[in-house]
């Protein structure tokens, strides 16, 4: 900290020509803060200076505070030192302004027309079945062809683009390479060949999630850094998203990024046969820990389209710094048409698909997400055999329901003299004691996030544990999230409530061949 030596070294470095020069400086951590800080390894543990430390700093810097004033931890006000402020500003002007400085240019794109998202509004036709991953790829193509955002859509894939069914985009939009195609790909004779181009729009990053996430950050912050807004979609094997690069996603949030993270091949049982390394049932839970991320688990194509439409509107029209994480799956099933007036419920996180049929007999409420919704629909039919009627609900985001719950709780806590507000969950479900079964292809902790705002008799089924290599049917039976498990959970609640006799449950368990024993070699 010898300023004469410091300036002499810098002057020599500037004067040296012909090769790079490094000035190596040995400094003392906490220098200038007094003997209690300087050179002590406790600097980060010191959160507050005592009076003797303040006196040292005052005397060392020539400040005019009295000992009595120091007891109140006074600030040095800029107005009291105009000559120093003027000097500091002049130095910053020489360095092209203050750093860091965030410039927020006007958004230079518009939102696509509603028809861009409408392909699946009428559902699938005939015997056609699609997965939500397939629906996403078709929606992505529609966005890339739209006049509003087409050239600004940035698809980023670190691996498995063909697994996700994205190979049709290779020839149509090209894979970006700064020098174009430098080799003949092994699939050059097929229609959907691997096509690299200087003008390509897709980013294929190889098996490099850190690099792909960095590309996502660059694209997701380009509206601020370059005044050119893009709409990035980072598509990855869901297990290798938050589990592998959560710190980079936190960094993206810190940089106020905007874009979509698509956790493809999601689900502990839906991605079957790939064991504990790949079968993901916890990324949604991890996504909910990031304050800048909205996390979604759509069951149907129209839900997916509604969520993406809402996300683009948030980023472009509402000018929000937000990241949307969407779980999509590889299980094919018929997609129903979009019901009327469900957009609000989809975005809030919960809506009714169908009420209980008229008639006699007890009623249960079944809540599904993702492709496990098909197991819910299977349970509806099984329950009818035992005289039980079912309401069917779709939970698109337990995270959004929880955000709403916490916000309402805070308002009620701070306004005890006013009529208490209700959460969206409470508004939808009321205070009925009707048994509720919520089932997910993720850990039970995901639907459990909203237990506080649920009515009584709320039961959750999830896929806690390691993934296992087997068929979907076997996995769902093992994790107890199949139609049979949902049926038995509903009957069990009805027995507890006194609506049916225990013999009805026993009859169902016998019919489905259920054993209460479970062999899990991974249990601790």
Task: Annotate the PLM regions.
Residues 1-336, 343-344, 399, ...:
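Thiamine diphosphate
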């Amino acid at each position: 900290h010898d300023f004469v030596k410091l300036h002499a070294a810098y002057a020599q470095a500037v004067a040296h020509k012909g090769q790079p020069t490094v000035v190596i400086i040995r400094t003392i951590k906490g220098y200038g803060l007094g003997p209690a800080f300087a050179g002590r390894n406790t600097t980060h543990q010191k959160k507050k200076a005592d009076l003797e430390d303040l006196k040292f700093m005052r005397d060392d810097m020539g400040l005019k505070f009295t000992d009595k004033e120091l007891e109140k931890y006074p600030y040095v006000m800029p107005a009291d030192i105009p000559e120093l402020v003027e000097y500091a500003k002049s130095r910053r002007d020489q360095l092209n302004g203050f750093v860091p400085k965030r410039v927020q240019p006007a958004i230079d794109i518009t939102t696509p027309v509603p028809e861009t998202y409408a392909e699946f509004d009428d559902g699938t036709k005939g015997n056609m079945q699609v997965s939500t991953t397939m629906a996403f790829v078709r929606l992505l193509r529609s966005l890339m062809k739209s006049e509003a955002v087409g050239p600004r859509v940035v698809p980023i894939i670190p691996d498995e683009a063909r697994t996700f069914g994205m190979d049709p985009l290779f020839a149509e939009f090209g894979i970006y390479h700064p020098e174009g195609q430098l080799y003949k790909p092994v699939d050059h004779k097929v229609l959907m060949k691997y096509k690299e181009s200087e003008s390509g729009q897709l980013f294929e990053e190889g098996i490099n999630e850190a690099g792909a996430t960095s590309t996502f950050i660059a694209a997701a912050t380009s509206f601020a850094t370059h005044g050119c807004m893009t709409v990035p979609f980072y598509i990855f094997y869901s297990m290798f998203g938050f589990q592998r690069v959560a710190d980079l996603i936190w960094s993206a949030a810190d940089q106020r990024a905007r874009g979509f993270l698509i956790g493809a091949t999601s689900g502990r049982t839906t991605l079957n046969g790939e064991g504990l390394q790949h079968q993901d049932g916890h990324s949604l839970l991890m996504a909910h820990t990031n304050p800048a991320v909205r996390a979604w688990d759509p069951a149907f194509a129209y839900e997916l389209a509604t969520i993406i439409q809402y996300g683009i509107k948030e980023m472009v029209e509402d000018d929000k710094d937000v990241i949307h994480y969407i779980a999509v799956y590889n299980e094919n099933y018929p997609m129903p048409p979009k019901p009327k007036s469900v957009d609000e419920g989809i975005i809030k996180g919960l809506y009714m698909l169908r009420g209980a049929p008229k008639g006699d007999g007890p009623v249960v409420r079944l809540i599904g997400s993702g492709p496990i919704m098909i197991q819910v629909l299977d349970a509806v039919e099984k329950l009818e055999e035992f005289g039980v009627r079912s309401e069917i609900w779709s939970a698109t985001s337990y995270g959004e329901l929880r955000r709403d719950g916490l916000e309402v709780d805070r308002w009620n806590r701070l306004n005890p003299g006013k009529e208490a507000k209700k959460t969206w969950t409470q508004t939808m479900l009321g205070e009925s004691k009707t048994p509720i079964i919520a089932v997910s292809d993720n850990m039970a902790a995901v639907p459990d996030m909203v237990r506080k705002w649920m009515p009584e008799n709320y039961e959750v089924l999830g896929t806690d544990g390691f993934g296992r290599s087997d068929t979907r049917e076997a996995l769902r039976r093992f994790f107890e999230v199949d139609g049979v498990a949902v049926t038995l959970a509903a009957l069990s609640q009805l027995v507890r409530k006194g609506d049916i006799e225990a013999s009805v449950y026993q009859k169902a368990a016998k019919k489905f061949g259920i054993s209460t024993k479970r062999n899990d070699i991974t249990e601790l």
